[in-house]
């Protein structure tokens, strides 16, 4: 989908030329891409629609994950023949023709475990292996074992795993880190990108691109050999995110690429399909029907693209925070995504240099420098004093402060003075008694107040430390860890998200109940434990008093969350 091209001719910019040269390198590892596995809504057609619409299962993901016991075409033919017969029982038909996903066994930790011991004991519990899957299974096979988040999430998720891997590395499980990098490289080789998760219904989109950072993490243990080994896959993923750029004129967008009027190249989230998500079928149809003024396909695409962002859902994507049907993810240029693209370009430059290709390294450096200028020009709100997303419809930077604003600091793309302003904004508007707020908006969506998420806590902590803002960074870690510890002390589990307006309470909102496990919370908790406790005195639980600032820590904001961005 392209927006109209401007009438005046545009000069070929330096940056697309660089991209052409970078893409030329991809020919060396181009492989035959097999037939893409079809998602269950396509395989099963009206049967899938009917099962989901009558809400046969409380969680729509259940039937999306069910495995047909025979050829779906035969099952569908039987369904069409039987469905109008007297006494037809849809539930019985499904039970006969499908193998439903098993409920995971509830993990009961041994008595008296510390927080660290509990997490270390969870790694094998959350590890799965699926070298082979059934022919019509929505689950995609992976060559190596992998760690799942936990709860209803029975598969590996892209950006979740980076933060899980941080914890694995902290625990010395470098073999598991290597396995998961190998799995993601396999997906790039097989499908041309890393899907949202290893399910057929996730193949039409990706998630925040952390693969290059995963390779960089592995290189901490294996050295430049890891960078050289996975350079082809990093290049291929970059090509996926920049697909279509060679045909863009100023003011146009194509899939995941945006070319602004001055030819600045940035990226957005995008899903290649514009139908309801199989795992949230009924909810998406209801959302689309609730706004008859917009084409349903447009709403479906924006819902899917929000899922690609990892922030599903948030006022960040919505015109009206109380109405999900006003989300327009594809017309927003996200600050976190473009920070990650900058980091990918920097790591590609480093890997190319390690491989002895200095010319290609220079090309990637040129791309990274251009993107950094674009971030500073378009994704900084000078009036508010923080980084924010850019609105393609209004042609202005948005006003809303979110935790995504810390990503330029995390990847070292921020100007020093702006990083200092971000520290002030974070302390004033986002820091709460239980950690960092995702936004300051109460919308009922899970990526809004009062929820705090482990990956965003770590991005903020590490990003602020990168710019010497250690006090604010340590306070974020301290408040969040206290929340995690209090919840663990009471419930003996770690959860997906937390209510940061207090301590000791899991988060709420969103499309499904609170999940426990939980991969990225485990990983970030281990990193933070080792951050707040000195190496000579490591801690297995969160200390009773602030270990760095003994007396007056930075006080979190006590302001009420605002109803609108």
From Swiss-Prot:
GO MF annotation terms: alpha,alpha-trehalase activity
Coiled coil: none
Transmembrane segments: none
Disulfide bridge map: none
Binding site for substrate: 152, 159-160, 196, 205-207, 277-279, 310, 511
Entry-linked SUPFAM superfamilies: Six-hairpin glycosidases
Comp. bias intervals (Polar residues): 548-565
Keyword hit for Hydrolase: yes
EC numbers: 3.2.1.28
Record keyword Signal present: yes
Listed GO CC annotations: periplasmic space
Intracellular or extracellular location(s): Periplasm
Catalytic site: 312 (proton donor/acceptor), 496 (proton donor/acceptor)
One of the protein's GO biological processes: trehalose catabolic process
Region of interest (Disordered), ranges: 540-565
PROSITE patterns the record matches: TREHALASE_1 (PS00927), TREHALASE_2 (PS00928)
Main location: periplasm
Quaternary structure, from the entry: Monomer.
UniProt similarity note: Belongs to the glycosyl hydrolase 37 family.
NCBIfam families in the record: PRK13270.1, PRK13271.1
The protein, known as: Periplasmic trehalase
Organism (species): Shigella flexneri
């Amino acid at each position: 989908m392209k927006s109209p091209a401007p009438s005046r001719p545009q000069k070929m910019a330096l940056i697309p030329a660089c991209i052409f040269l970078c893409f030329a390198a991809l020919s060396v590892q181009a492989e035959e891409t097999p037939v893409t596995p079809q998602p269950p809504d396509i395989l099963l057609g009206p049967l899938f629609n009917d099962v989901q619409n009558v809400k046969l299962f409380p969680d729509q993901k259940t039937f999306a994950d069910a495995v047909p016991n025979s050829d779906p075409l035969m099952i569908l033919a039987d369904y069409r023949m039987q469905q109008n017969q007297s006494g037809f029982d849809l539930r019985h038909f499904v039970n006969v023709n499908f193998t439903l996903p098993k409920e995971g066994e509830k993990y009961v930790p041994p008595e008296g475990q510390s927080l660290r011991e509990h997490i270390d004991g969870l790694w094998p519990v959350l590890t799965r292996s699926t070298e082979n899957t059934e022919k019509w299974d929505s689950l995609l096979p992976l060559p190596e074992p992998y760690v799942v988040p936990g709860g209803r999430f029975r598969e590996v998720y892209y950006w979740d795993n980076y933060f899980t891997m941080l914890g694995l590395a902290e625990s010395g499980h470098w073999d598991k880190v290597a396995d998961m990098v190998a799995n993601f490289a396999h997906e790039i080789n097989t499908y041309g990108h890393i899907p949202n998760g290893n399910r057929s219904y996730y193949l039409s989109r990706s998630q925040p691109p952390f693969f290059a950072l995963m390779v960089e993490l592995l290189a901490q243990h294996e050295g430049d050999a890891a960078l050289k080994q996975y350079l082809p896959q990093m290049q291929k993923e970059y090509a996926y995110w920049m697909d279509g750029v060679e045909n863009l004129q100023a003011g146009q967008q194509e899939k995941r690429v945006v070319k602004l009027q001055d030819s600045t190249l940035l990226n957005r989230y995008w899903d290649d399909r514009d139908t309801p998500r199989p795992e949230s079928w009924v909810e998406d149809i209801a959302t689309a029907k609730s706004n008859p003024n917009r084409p349903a396909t447009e709403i479906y695409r924006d819902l899917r693209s929000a899922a690609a962002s990892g922030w599903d859902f948030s006022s960040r994507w919505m015109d009206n925070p109380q109405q999900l049907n006003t989300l327009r993810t594809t017309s927003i240029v996200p600050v976190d995504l473009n920070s990650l693209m900058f980091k990918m370009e920097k790591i590609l430059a480093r890997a190319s240099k390690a491989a002895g290709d200095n010319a290609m390294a220079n090309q990637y450096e040129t791309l990274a420098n251009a993107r950094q200028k674009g971030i500073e020009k378009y994704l900084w709100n000078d009036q508010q004093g923080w980084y924010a997303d850019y609105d393609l419809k209004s042609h202005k930077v948005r006003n809303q402060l979110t935790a995504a604003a810390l990503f330029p600091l995390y990847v070292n793309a921020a100007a020093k003075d702006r990083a200092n302003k971000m520290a002030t904004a974070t302390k004033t508007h986002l820091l709460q008694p239980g950690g960092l707020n995702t936004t300051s908006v109460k919308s009922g969506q899970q990526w809004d107040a009062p929820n705090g998420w482990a990956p965003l806590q770590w991005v903020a902590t590490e990003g602020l430390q990168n710019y010497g803002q250690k006090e604010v960074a340590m306070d974020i870690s301290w408040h969040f860890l206290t929340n995690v510890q209090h919840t663990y002390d009471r419930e003996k589990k770690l959860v997906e998200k937390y209510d940061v307006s207090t301590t000791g309470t899991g988060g709420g909102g969103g499309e499904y109940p609170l999940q426990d496990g939980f991969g990225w919370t485990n990983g970030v908790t281990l990193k933070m434990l080792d951050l707040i406790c000195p190496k000579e005195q490591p801690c297995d639980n969160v200390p009773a008093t602030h270990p760095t600032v003994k007396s007056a820590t930075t006080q979190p904001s006590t302001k009420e969350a605002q109803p609108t961005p």
